């Protein structure tokens, strides 16, 4: 269809061009002059009518005083920024616009050549007639860039200089003002009574154009049109590409008269949406074009048409001459040129609408100036033409206004596109290519500012005369209007018109403040940024009522109200959406706060749990520590108990033995009646006369009796001698006694030769027996110095080798009651008892050869006096005469024998002599500070000579023990310990007695009355069948005598004294009941008793180490060698 239209247009154009050539022939010279006047705007290919058009335009413009001057001079009123720039001074008269555009259109097309690439039909809603007219009026590229607003921008990159060929043709014919005048006359002649529009409707398909112009235009238009039809297919709406001006006119007529659907109108509406745009865009020219086309087509055959033209343009040869003819022409032209220059200098931005109006109104204000510019002979003709034109223009302007309103509606609908909202006007038009789109995100428009796209109203206003149409469009322009303010900044010309037009709608869509400057959506009711979502599309979709409306129909009030309501609803929904978003945000914030709180609580719970766990762990550790400590304490306690048990074990063992190891001890007689228990005692501690002894006290003797030592009370220091664990430990006992004593006691060596020993040990004859024995049992180094001994300053260990070879002792257990009084003497009341106690001695304790060396020196012819030897320690080999049968048969220890029994055994007189001598020696040894006490009491004072004894440990625990050879000499039987202080020639043995270490505690022993021999005394039940191996006797510590000094009060009690022989104080290192002292004689001759009986028991006081005898006994001179057992034997003492 487009092709048919193109062909028809070409044919009609050829016809028109032919008629135009005829007309042009008449005006050759005038056209040449007009061409010269046109300058660059006219092309040589353009025909005469174009030149006539320009000349006529100028002439008419000069004559018109009603703002109908073509905007060529001043561009009319500048459109502001809406039409691209003030370069196009636009006048309201579409006729003049059409004339100017018609004059320039073909020439511009020719100048562009094939460069014009956009067919008019394919430029939807982008060609306002005023724009194209003004664009055509401008020179050079101004005409090329005069394409309507957004369309020119949309296609500006590809086709920067595109004239509007369609409107150019229309404008060409419309610009021939003389044709209109001739048109009426020609119409009257050919078709009388038919008016321009009617003629156009009658001949809608006749495409009128001047012959020379049509070929050029058609050629230049068709080729680019075909080229550009494809690019514009997708983005832009397609309208029938027929470039002829007739189809728009036909469209307009058809749209106005829908009862006469013409092919052109149908073709114009092939594309529903672009067709209204195209028609509306071209409608402004269609009345003019129609009439002018009719005039062009109808009048060319008639010659009179050329005559008015020749008459019209006869005197006008150039613009220069026009200026010279017009008195104010220079001023007017200057004003117009100034506005054009300003618009050109503004970079394509035209001046504001006020400037446009001002340019056209200046002419109106000057008034009458046009007459001065016209020749006098043409005044009447021009006036007639003006009247005709005015009448025609009035009709055209009214039609144009209506069309402009519709066009404006369509354009404004495109000017505010939304991505998802398709206005019913152009459903196929993509949003990016709307002609009046304000914010096109895709395309840039270098030639025009965005504000230039917003002035459809200014186009319509300027396309019609200001004064004659009843518009109250503008005021008299002031100087401030020359500032060329932008469209959006000044809207003073947007006042309502007296006639209803589309401006009211324009004011509705475009408030006073610029859409360009104001953010979209603030002043515009539509969402220009496409912020509406799909949910709002139903509310913002105007297609239902817009598409149902014909393209040329006006928007009704109801539709506007619906639009407003939809927009309000949209904003309401938008508000609700925002509120929902805020609610969601608050909810999310609350959830986040709750999550944070929960996390905080969880963290706090974890921390609390960790602290609690740590506390539990700490408690557990503390409990484990306490438990471990408790276990450790229990272990220590267990160890202590085990240690104590081990310490007590030997005690128990010794208690279980009938006779334990020989331990020295003194038993204090604490009871008036001597009761000797049969239990075994392993150790005896001394008891004081004033307090009952604590036999289980194992504290060290030094600490228990610390600070209590004194000269008079030194016997209790014997306790210190026995505080040695070695006495209770079998290991130590074995170490001490399990072999050679030399190994256990390195300081002890047995005497090899008694005679040699006498010589070497002279001056150290005696050693305290208790010291030697304790040293013997306590590893030989317990008492290197006796701090409690006031008289002994040397260690007794040095004198240990001088111990008597034979020392015997026994223990008598006594009960604890009766402290301080000696118990009743255990006596042999009959010979049978005595014989039973000594029957085992028949076997002999030592072999005979052990005493052969001493036989010649020791009491020749007399038996060895053993007054206190144990039952099994008989010495049958000492003397050819065996001991008396009574003593042999008595099972009691000889230390318990009474004087009567001992008296029977002692028969030699020299023993008495020795006894007396020793008595004298002892008397001399009394301590000076104790002499008064001896005189008052008549007691012998001395360190108790507890003679060393030799008990065969092999019978119990001591495996190897050598028999001790007893020294025999002519000296006395014993030597007082005082002889230690000085060398004594009277003491050939120098070891007869051992001094008891000084003690801090005195034991008072009451010697009970002696019993008659016939009385039955306590029988000592001790095994006598045990054999004691013989061996050398070892002196434990030879240096003992050096550290010990014998007390001068020490005395030797005679064995025959019944009270003393049976009463003695027993000392033992372990808790024991009190034991009676055991008298031990070392080869002491037992003298016959001077007094067989002692009438009363005398109290016996043990001094530091002595037994105090009664004066009566001292007078008798009977002395008895008393032996203190340092360790209590497990002797079962029979009472």
Curated annotation (Swiss-Prot):
Effect of residue 83 to A: Abolishes interaction with PtdIns(4,5)P2 and cell membrane localization
Membrane topology: Peripheral membrane protein
Record keyword Cytoplasm present: yes
Molecular function as annotated in GO: beta-catenin binding; beta-catenin destruction complex binding; phosphatidylinositol-4,5-bisphosphate binding
Keywords for this protein: Acetylation, Cell membrane, Cytoplasm, Lipid-binding, Membrane, Nucleus, Phosphoprotein, Wnt signaling pathway
Low complexity bias: start-end ranges: 10-19, 36-50, 1058-1069
Biased composition (Acidic residues): 373-405, 926-938
Annotated effect of mutating residue 181 to A: Abolishes interaction with PtdIns(4,5)P2 and cell membrane localization
Effect annotated for changing residue 166 to A: Abolishes interaction with PtdIns(4,5)P2 and cell membrane localization
Region (Disordered): 1-115, 156-308, 339-405, 447-484, 736-764, 921-948, 1007-1135
Residue(s) carrying Phosphoserine: 246
GO BP terms: adipose tissue development; bone development; mesenchymal cell differentiation involved in kidney development; negative regulation of canonical Wnt signaling pathway; positive regulation of canonical Wnt signaling pathway; positive regulation of protein catabolic process; positive regulation of protein ubiquitination; regulation of canonical Wnt signaling pathway
Modified positions (N-acetylmethionine) in chain numbering: 1
Main location: cytoplasm
Compositionally biased tracts (Gly residues): 73-83
Entry's localization field: Cytoplasm; Cell membrane; Nucleus
Tissue: Detected in fetal and adult kidney, brain and spleen.
Quaternary structure annotation from Swiss-Prot or TrEMBL: Interacts with CTNNB1, AXIN1, LRP6, KEAP1, APC and BTRC. Interacts with SCF (SKP1-CUL1-F-box protein) E3 ubiquitin-protein ligase complexes containing BTRC and/or FBXW11. Identified in the beta-catenin destruction complex containing CTNNB1, APC, AXIN1 and AXIN2. Interacts with WT1.
Other known facts: Inactivated in approximately one-third of Wilms tumors.
Entry-linked PANTHER family: APC MEMBRANE RECRUITMENT PROTEIN 1, APC MEMBRANE RECRUITMENT PROTEIN 2-RELATED
Disorder this protein is connected to according to its UniProt record: Osteopathia striata with cranial sclerosis: An X-linked dominant sclerosing bone dysplasia that presents in females with macrocephaly, cleft palate, facial palsy, conductive hearing loss, mild learning disabilities, sclerosis of the long bones and skull. Longitudinal striations are visible on radiographs of the long bones, pelvis, and scapulae (osteopathia striata). In males this entity is usually associated with fetal or neonatal lethality. Occasional surviving males have, in addition to hyperostosis, cardiac, intestinal, and genitourinary malformations.
Function: Regulator of the canonical Wnt signaling pathway. Acts by specifically binding phosphatidylinositol 4,5-bisphosphate (PtdIns(4,5)P2), translocating to the cell membrane and interacting with key regulators of the canonical Wnt signaling pathway, such as components of the beta-catenin destruction complex. Acts both as a positive and negative regulator of the Wnt signaling pathway, depending on the context: acts as a positive regulator by promoting LRP6 phosphorylation.
Protein family membership: Belongs to the Amer family.
UniProt protein name: APC membrane recruitment protein 1
Species of provenance: Homo sapiens
